[in-house]
């Protein structure tokens, strides 16, 4: 007798057999096709005890059916046809189509039809492990003794033992290392999975998620079988879980039977290290979703109707193929069966492309991608940009040389059939998941966060916990902290305005080596849907979206870029000043309207890009020139700069006292004295939970006092510049103050924006303007520098110089042409202030705009 390990491959031997169930009278047992040649002349019983097949008329014989499906209750040992559990997940001995009047006939289809993620396992051979020939009278045995003898062909999985072990695991397992945050609402001293079954009864979602680490600590052998033979073992788990559930809750009504979903398999592989030994095994990989397809209908059961006599029949899909009936069983007409689509059964299917995470990539390598297929309720569970741990079965499918020829290539195509998604990342903030919002925080954690929010110095403590290794820059850290919290989302569509931007945009600019990039990297590693990109290595389509041909459907599809992938997150853009003009132009719509309009290759759509932009830029001369404005230093268009709520300068002061304090701070990162070790720092996990809770549950609204304070602040800002003929504020500055005030109220866990929030927003906004919008010639804050690209004094000086030049030309009399160089020297000699060539050119352009003169080459001609 061959052992299970030496049996042929289960892939090759999953076809059905037409054998009859064993009888207790000693008749010859018909062997499977592989054994038929050896036993056709023999009168003794064959070595292998076959499985009864489904569609034959053997339903009247309860012996074969009781073997797999009879309930443990003693009253059901004499099972009749109506008592057979025909909806068992393993479909051993079940009919190939639905049978009317079966138990739970209201459930559409068996779990084998409802679990396309496990592939087709309708007909599975079983092997008798006993090497001795049993006597004829010994064949009449109990269900338990027969179950102990049988394993699934090609494996060492004993169905009865496997089911018994899993039931024992569900009923007894208590996790000694369980954390309360991960098991909200569960008693950690009671069996976890029995409480999960109770949740299923209350909520009605028939999915039981099983941690493979729990299974491995409870039963190593059962865990090994699950990893090696998931296609055979998971249906057994389904069967065991359903038996426990319906025995405990017999009156419960579910949409379909409970499906067990294992996750966190120890066989976690890097995506690039998957190899042929992992095929058909349970694996867990991690990565970032970069593309999801549309929902694809996949046929599970075909409905055929005879065109002659209207006889109907159903055929299940086996390994992606339909066995079309060639002869009608009712009228014996050949080739008369037609497929009726609207009577067939379909399941949802979706293709997901998963890309390797940057932290898993070896140095100098490009990221690998793999194809996932999600089925039924796993469709639309993840979106592009999500970082997920995926548990599934690794598959290899042949590729045909020609679709019309059955020859296949020797190289197979691989994919993963998804069984479980887990959107978790310990290093990042909790993602806002609509399904798990209520389960994110325990009552104790919420109480601790609210106690922390009641402290008067919580704003400063949170800011100091943000990037503690970076010295000083308190106002910049406070601005980034408010960006992480964000404002309150509002909808003004009834007024015709549309959506009001709630995200805060921040620009950091200054000398090289002032830790701008470190701040960006810190924020990128903190937020759940963050993207990090560099200005020089980014293109317009890489930031927005581009059209590509889908390799599966050969149709044009839209591939999203960094700004769309960071929707509801933060997009960090380094080297912002080195972007080319076409790349920067796509940011205008995103930074104000929070949408992205696409019209390419016949695809016209508008994508959501509700992302905050945190950008860093270096000055053109490699060092900040205090005699130039911000726009002149970083060479960015004023239309883009005006969309940033806060623009901070990070300059190197070149002061000995500052240098000494900075050096002391850097050395302290490597060596801490006892006094420094005693200093209290806010835990990083607390900071993440604090921000996540505020973003999810705190939505402050403006109060009456805060509204009046905002109005007064805006009027005061306008009043400052009106006396000097310059504009010091625009409506965008007022909206920025509103967003910053709401974010500061979120820091305090306040549902109402108060005057204290407006005062802090005013102070932070004023500090940023002091640095970025100060006119270097007058030392006065002039918002026109950011909105129009030129300060009011520069504009006034330009107009005055143009008038002086005009008077100089008029004093020369009616001369039709003047030499450029001579006119420039005459102007310099007449003017008291120093006149540069650029200023002279600007004056000429101003007069040219008035149609007073024109410049051709080195000659100035009057009009």
Curated annotation (Swiss-Prot):
Physiological role: Acts as a component of the MCM2-7 complex (MCM complex) which is the replicative helicase essential for 'once per cell cycle' DNA replication initiation and elongation in eukaryotic cells. Core component of CDC45-MCM-GINS (CMG) helicase, the molecular machine that unwinds template DNA during replication, and around which the replisome is built.
Misc. remarks from the entry:
Early fractionation of eukaryotic MCM proteins yielded a variety of dimeric, trimeric and tetrameric complexes with unclear biological significance. Specifically a MCM467 subcomplex is shown to have in vitro helicase activity which is inhibited by the MCM2 subunit. The MCM2-7 hexamer is the proposed physiological active complex.
Task: Tell me the subunit arrangement.
Answer: Component of the mcm2-7 complex (RLF-M). The complex forms a toroidal hexameric ring with the proposed subunit order mcm2-mcm6-mcm4-mcm7-mcm3-mcm5. The heterodimer of mmcm3/mcm5 interacts with mcm4, mmcm6, mcm7 and weakly with mcm2. Component of the CMG helicase complex, composed of the mcm2-7 complex, the GINS complex and cdc45.
| C4-type zinc finger segments | 306-331
Entry's Pfam families?
MCM, MCM4_WHD, MCM_lid, MCM_N, MCM_OB
Name the enzyme's class: hydrolase
Tell me which residues make up the MCM domain: 458-667
The record's PANTHER family line, in alphabetical order, gives: DNA REPLICATION LICENSING FACTOR MCM FAMILY MEMBER, DNA REPLICATION LICENSING FACTOR MCM4
Regions of compositional bias (Polar residues) in chain numbering: 54-64, 78-99
Question: What PTMs does it carry?
Answer: Hyperphosphorylated during mitosis in a mechanism requiring cdc2-cyclin B and other kinases. Undergoes dephosphorylation after exiting mitosis, existing in a partially phosphorylated state in the cytosolic interphase mcm complex which associates with the pre-replication complexes (pre-Rcs). Complete dephosphorylation inactivates the mcm complex, preventing its binding to chromatin. Becomes actively phosphorylated during S phase once the mcm complex is assembled on the chromatin. This chromatin-associated phosphorylation occurs during the activation of the pre-Rcs and is independent of cdks.
What segment(s) does the record annotate as region Disordered? 1-121
Residues the entry annotates as binding ATP 1: 497, 643, 732, 735
EC numbers on record: 3.6.4.12
Location of the motif Arginine finger: 642-645
**Gene Ontology BP term (one):** regulation of DNA-templated DNA replication initiation
InterPro entries xrefs: MCM (IPR031327), MCM_4 (IPR008047), MCM_CS (IPR018525), MCM_dom (IPR001208), MCM_lid (IPR041562), MCM_N (IPR027925), MCM_OB (IPR033762), NA-bd_OB-fold (IPR012340)
Which family does the record assign?
Answer: Belongs to the MCM family.
What name is this protein filed under?
DNA replication licensing factor mcm4
Can you tell me which residues bind ATP 2? 471, 516-517, 618
Q: Which UniProt keywords apply?
A: ATP-binding, Cell cycle, Chromosome, DNA replication, DNA-binding, Helicase, Hydrolase, Metal-binding, Nucleotide-binding, Nucleus, Phosphoprotein, Zinc, Zinc-finger
Q: Which gene encodes it?
A: mcm4
Instruction: Kindly list the places in or outside the cell where this protein is found, as annotated in its UniProt entry.
Output: Nucleus; Chromosome
A GO MF annotation of the entry reads: ATP hydrolysis activity
Could you state one GO cellular component term attached to this entry?
chromatin
The record's catalysed reaction(s) read: ATP + H2O = ADP + phosphate + H(+)
Q: Which organism was this protein described from?
A: Xenopus tropicalis
């Amino acid at each position: 007798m061959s052992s299970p390990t030496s049996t042929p491959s289960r892939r090759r031997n999953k076809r059905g057999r037409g054998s009859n169930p064993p009888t207790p009278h000693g008749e010859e047992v018909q062997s499977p096709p592989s054994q038929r040649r050896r036993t056709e002349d023999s009168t003794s019983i064959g070595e292998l005890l076959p499985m009864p097949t489904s569609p034959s008329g053997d339903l009247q014989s309860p012996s074969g059916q009781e073997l797999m499906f009879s309930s443990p209750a003693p009253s059901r040992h004499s099972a009749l046809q109506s008592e057979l559990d025909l909806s068992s997940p393993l479909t051993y001995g079940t009919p190939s189509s639905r049978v009317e009047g079966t138990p739970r006939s209201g459930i559409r289809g068996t779990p084998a039809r409802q679990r396309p993620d496990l592939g087709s396992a309708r007909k599975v051979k079983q092997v008798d492990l006993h090497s001795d020939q049993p006597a004829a009278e010994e064949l009449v045995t109990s269900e338990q003794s027969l179950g102990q003898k049988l394993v699934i062909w090609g494996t060492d999985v004993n169905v009865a033992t496997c089911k018994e072990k899993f039931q024992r695991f569900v009923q007894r397992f208590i996790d000694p290392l369980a954390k309360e945050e991960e098991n909200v609402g569960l008693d950690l001293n009671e069996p976890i999975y029995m409480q999960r079954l109770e949740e299923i009864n209350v909520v009605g979602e028939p999915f039981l998620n099983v941690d493979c680490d729990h299974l491995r600590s409870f039963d190593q052998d059962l865990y090994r079988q699950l990893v090696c033979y998931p296609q055979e073992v998971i249906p057994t788990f389904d069967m065991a879980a359903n038996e426990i559930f319906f025995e405990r809750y017999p009156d419960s009504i579910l949409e379909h039977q409970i499906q067990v979903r294992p996750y966190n398999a120890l066989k976690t592989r890097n995506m690039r290290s998957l190899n042929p030994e992992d095929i058909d095994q349970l694996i867990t990989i991690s990565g970032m979703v970069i593309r999801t397809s549309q929902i694809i209908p996949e046929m599970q059961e075909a409905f055929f109707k005879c065109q002659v006599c209207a006889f109907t029949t159903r055929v299940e899909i086996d390994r992606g193929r339909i066995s079309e009936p060639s002869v009608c069983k009712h009228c014996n007409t050949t080739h008369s069966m037609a497929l009726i689509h609207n009577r067939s059964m379909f399941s949802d299917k979706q293709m997901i492309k998963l890309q390797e995470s940057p932290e898993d990539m070896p140095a100098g390598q490009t990221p690998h991608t793999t194809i996932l297929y999600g089925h039924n309720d796993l469709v639309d569970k993840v979106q592009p940009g999500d970082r997920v741990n995926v548990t599934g079965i690794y598959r290899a499918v042949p590729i045909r040389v020609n679709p019309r020829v059955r020859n296949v290539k020797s190289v197979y195509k691989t994919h993963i059939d998804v069984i479980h998604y887990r959107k978790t990342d310990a290093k990042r903030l909790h993602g806002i998941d609509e399904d798990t919002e209520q389960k994110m925080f325990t009552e104790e954690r919420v109480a601790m966060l609210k106690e922390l929010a009641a402290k008067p110095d919580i704003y400063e403590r949170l800011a100091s916990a943000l990037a503690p290794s970076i010295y000083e820059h308190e106002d910049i850290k406070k601005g980034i902290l408010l960006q992480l919290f964000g404002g309150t989302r509002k909808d003004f569509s009834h007024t015709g305005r549309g959506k009001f931007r709630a995200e805060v945009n921040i620009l950091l600019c200054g000398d090289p080596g002032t830790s701008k990039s470190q701040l960006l990297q810190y924020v990128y590693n903190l937020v759940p849907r963050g993207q990090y990109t560099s200005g020089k290595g980014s293109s317009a389509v890489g930031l927005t979206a581009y059209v590509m041909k889908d390799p599966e459907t050969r149709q044009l599809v839209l591939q999203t870029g960094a700004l769309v992938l960071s929707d509801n997150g933060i997009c960090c853009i380094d080297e912002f000043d080195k972007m080319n003009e076409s790349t920067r132009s796509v940011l205008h719509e995103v930074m104000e309207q929070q949408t992205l309009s696409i019209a390419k290759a016949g695809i016209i759509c508008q994508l959501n890009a509700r992302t905050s932009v945190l950008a860093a830029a270096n000055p053109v001369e490699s060092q900040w020139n205090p005699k130039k404005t911000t726009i002149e230093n970083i060479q960015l268009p004023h239309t883009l700069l005006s969309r940033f709520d806060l623009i901070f300068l990070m300059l190197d002061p070149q002061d000995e006292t500052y240098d000494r304090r900075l050096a002391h701070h850097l050395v302290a990162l490597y060596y801490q004295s006892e006094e420094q070790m005693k200093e209290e720092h806010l835990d990083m996990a607390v900071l993440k939970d604090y921000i996540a809770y505020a973003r999810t549950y705190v939505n402050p609204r403006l109060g009456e006092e805060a509204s009046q304070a905002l109005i007064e602040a805006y009027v005061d800002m306008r009043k400052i510049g009106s006396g000097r003929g310059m504009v010091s504020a625009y409506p965008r500055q007022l909206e920025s103050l509103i967003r910053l005030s709401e974010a500061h109220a979120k820091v305090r866990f306040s549902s109402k924006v108060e005057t204290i929030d407006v005062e802090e927003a005013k102070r932070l906004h004023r500090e940023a303007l002091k640095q970025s919008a100060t006119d270097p010639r007058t030392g006065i804050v002039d918002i026109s520098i950011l909105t129009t690209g030129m300060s009011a004094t520069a504009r006034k000086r330009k107009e005055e110089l143009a008038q002086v030049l005009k008077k100089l030309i008029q004093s020369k009399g009616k001369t039709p042409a003047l030499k450029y160089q001579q006119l420039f020297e005459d102007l310099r000699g007449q003017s008291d202030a120093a006149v540069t060539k650029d200023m002279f050119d600007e004056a000429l352009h101003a007069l040219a705009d008035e149609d007073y003169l024109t410049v051709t080459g080195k000659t100035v001609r009057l009009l």
